[in-house]
């Protein structure tokens, strides 16, 4: 099936890029926990609102890693294709073996397009995202630009219509900063698997794990194991 071949190709490509990216890098390993809430709320047939907050902590919650908030406006072509433009606020904190010098805020403009499809008992989601990132560091502000590709597959358990498994792969590609091309083309790679429960009203919860490779421009890298606990609740204001 087409989506399966895409996933295999992407995994192979990312594996090769990861192996190259980790050569001669100082790699640190951490354990994190991300607590997340998402919503896509339909206002009309064409328009909706995206809401998101992620409470990212070190360990199981001991200290801050990152606080992330996103809001956006959705435009729906139909129930399986929609685009979003929005704003994100992210505060990053010093943590772990390779801490940043001081906490800083990021203001992010982002655009994305999502497609959804079914292949037998498998449900596929593809997300294509662009980000324009204003990094307000104490040492000076800068702009960075990034592209992201996300593919997720989910499978409903037999005779258990409310339970389903999901897995995703996401690659983060650095485009350029204000003056120069980035020297770490692959900035992040994420691989995740989770078990999910969905109520009849569409609200769902997720518990899973994430393997994150974070590749920095200074020659360092992080390999992080992360617990994921998420809630998705979509509101529908259409008549």
Where in this protein do the model-derived segments appear?
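N-terminal signal peptide c-region/cleavage motif recognized by signal peptidases
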Residues: 16-19
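Start-of-domain marker
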Residues: 23-77, 82
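Residues that define the transmembrane beta-barrel architecture of outer-membrane proteins
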Residues: 31-33, 65-67, 105-109, 141-147, ...
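Membrane-embedded beta-strands of outer-membrane beta-barrel proteins
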Residues: 37, 70-71, 111-113, 149-153, ...
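Residue-level signature of outer-membrane beta-barrel architecture
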Residues: 41, 75, 115-117, 155-157, ...
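Repeated loop/turn-to-beta-strand initiation elements of outer-membrane beta-barrel proteins
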Residues: 45-51, 80-85, 120-124, 160-164, ...
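Transmembrane beta-barrel strands of outer-membrane/channel proteins
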Residues: 51-55, 85-89, 126-132, 167-171, ...
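Outer-membrane beta-barrel "beta-signal"
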Residues: 110-113, 223-239
């Amino acid at each position: 099936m087409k989506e399966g071949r895409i996933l295999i190709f992407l995994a192979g490509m990312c594996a090769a890029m990861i192996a190259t990216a980790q050569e001669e890098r100082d790699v640190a390993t951490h354990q994190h926990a991300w607590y997340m809430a998402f919503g896509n709320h339909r206002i009309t047939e064409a328009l909706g609102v995206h809401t998101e907050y992620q409470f990212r902590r070190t360990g199981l919650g001991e200290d801050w890693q990152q606080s992330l908030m996103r809001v956006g406006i959705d435009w729906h072509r139909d129930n399986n294709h929609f685009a979003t433009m929005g704003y994100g606020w992210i505060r990053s904190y010093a943590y772990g073996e390779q801490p940043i010098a001081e906490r800083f805020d990021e203001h992010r403009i982002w655009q994305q397009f999502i497609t959804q499809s079914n292949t037998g008992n498998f449900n596929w989601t593809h997300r294509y995202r662009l980000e324009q990132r204003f990094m307000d560091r104490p040492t000076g502000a800068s702009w960075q630009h990034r592209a992201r590709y996300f593919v997720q597959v989910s499978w409903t358990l037999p005779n258990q219509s409310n339970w389903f498994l999901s897995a995703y792969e996401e690659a983060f590609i650095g485009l350029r900063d204000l003056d120069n091309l980035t020297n770490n083309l692959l900035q992040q790679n994420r691989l995740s698997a989770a078990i999910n429960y969905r109520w009849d009203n569409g609200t769902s919860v997720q518990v899973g794990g994430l393997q994150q490779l974070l590749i920095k421009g200074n020659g360092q890298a992080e390999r992080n194991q992360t617990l994921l606990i998420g809630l998705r609740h979509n509101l529908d204001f259409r008549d």
